[in-house]
């Protein structure tokens, strides 16, 4: 824990815009628990990743990466082993990656996305032909699929504002029966699910069923940007459509991504880390449920649902007053559990949830 002394609370009762990427921090002589960031494995401030970036900058500077650079080849080889990806493109953010992906689909293509999917997907696809589906109602999804010819199915790994794992096998089965192009959305699951964080495609053994794989290095691996993986002919087509967008990325970013993959591939060490992380999340989820709070979460992204936006907003403000930082969206509050959170930290958090829940009449004792 570092003694960060930053200006966090510009307006009383609001979640601060800039919170240090630490599971806990000191502000105003008070210790705050930070559940805001996706950095569940606590790699954002990894000394190994910092040293990797520093050494690469000293050797290569911050010049953009040429597609033929050695580091790109190394990352390609590593991702080929980890994700079974034949070819790869790297992008600085989710939006640019999504726009590049959309370049290979025509105006008549219908995109099927879950109501609970990533916000970046919804933002980019809002001007395309979209059919929303609910993973609870696969019969309706089957009917929707039968009504369209050119179609693409986005399949999620983890729903970031529910905290549960998607029924990917069932959704993929329907998509294959309907001759959909299937895109695995690993933006919220790469680095967290599957063997050594290989993602939900690995967890559900869907390697042979997926046409395109998209994911993020920045959420759980302490790295930068996003990847887009597919067969070589598709990647070549995307590259033709977008020109040299992917070349404007400093090499040190790719070196950090490669180092992050090396960390999670250290089987003995990573196994202990993942076991502790999932033990922490199960402990928190179990106790929240025992209080009578509503959650369907089954991952380290723990989401609690309330009756309405106002109730969740008031709960979030009171959590800040009790030295707990959490994210809120509408009627939901999300806690991103870190491997660095101790049992005492989780007990402190649970106690504050109970105190606030009782004060607001949400928990009935």
Which role fits each region the language model picked out?
Residues 2-62:
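N-terminal "arm"/small-domain region of PLP-dependent enzymes with the aminotransferase-like
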Residues 13, 271-285, 289-322, 333, ...:
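Conserved PLP-binding catalytic core of the aspartate aminotransferase-like
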Residues 47, 51-55, 68-71, 77, ...:
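PLP-dependent enzyme catalytic core of the Aspartate aminotransferase-like
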Residues 54-93, 281:
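Conserved N-terminal alpha-helix of the aminotransferase class I/II PLP-enzyme fold
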Residues 101-119:
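Conserved PLP-anchoring active-site segment centered on the Schiff-base-forming lysine
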Residues 135-184:
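Active-site phosphate-binding strand-loop segment of PLP-dependent enzymes
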Residues 178-181, 188, 193-296:
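Active-site C-terminal subdomain of aminotransferase-like
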């Amino acid at each position: 824990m570092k003694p960060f002394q930053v200006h966090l609370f510009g307006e009383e009762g609001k979640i601060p815009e800039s919170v240090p990427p630490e599971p806990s921090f000191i502000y105003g002589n008070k210790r705050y628990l930070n559940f805001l960031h996706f950095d569940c494995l606590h790699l954002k401030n990894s000394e190994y990743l910092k040293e990797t970036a520093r050494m690469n900058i000293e050797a290569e500077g911050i010049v953009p990466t040429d597609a033929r650079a050695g580091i790109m080849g190394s990352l390609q080889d590593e991702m080929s082993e980890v994700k079974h990806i034949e070819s790869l493109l790297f992008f600085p953010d989710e939006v640019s990656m999504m726009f590049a992906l959309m370049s290979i689909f025509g105006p008549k293509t219908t995109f099927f996305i879950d109501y609970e999917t990533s916000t970046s997907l919804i933002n980019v696809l809002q001007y395309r032909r979209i059919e929303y589906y609910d993973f609870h109602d696969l019969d309706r999804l089957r009917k929707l699929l039968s009504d369209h010819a050119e179609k693409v199915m986005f399949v999620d790994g983890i729903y970031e504002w529910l905290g549960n794992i998607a029924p990917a096998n069932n959704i993929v089965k329907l998509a294959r029966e309907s001759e959909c192009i299937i895109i695995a959305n690993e933006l919220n699951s790469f680095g967290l699910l599957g063997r050594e964080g290989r993602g939900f495609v690995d967890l559900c053994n869907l390697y042979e069923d997926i046409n395109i794989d998209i994911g993020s290095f920045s959420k759980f691996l302490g790295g930068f940007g996003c990847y887009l993986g597919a067969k070589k002919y598709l990647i070549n087509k995307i590259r033709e459509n977008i020109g040299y967008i992917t070349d404007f990325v400093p090499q040190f970013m790719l070196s950090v991504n490669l180092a992050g993959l090396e960390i999670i591939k250290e089987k003995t060490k990573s196994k202990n880390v993942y076991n502790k992380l999932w033990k922490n999340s199960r402990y928190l989820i179990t106790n929240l449920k025992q209080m009578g709070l509503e959650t369907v979460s089954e991952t380290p992204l723990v989401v609690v649902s309330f009756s309405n936006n106002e109730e969740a907003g008031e709960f979030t403000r009171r959590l800040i007053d009790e030295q707990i930082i959490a994210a809120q969206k509408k009627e939901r509050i999300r806690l991103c559990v870190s491997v660095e959170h101790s049992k005492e930290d989780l007990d402190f958090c649970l106690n504050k949830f109970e105190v606030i829940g009782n004060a607001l009449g949400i928990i009935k004792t």
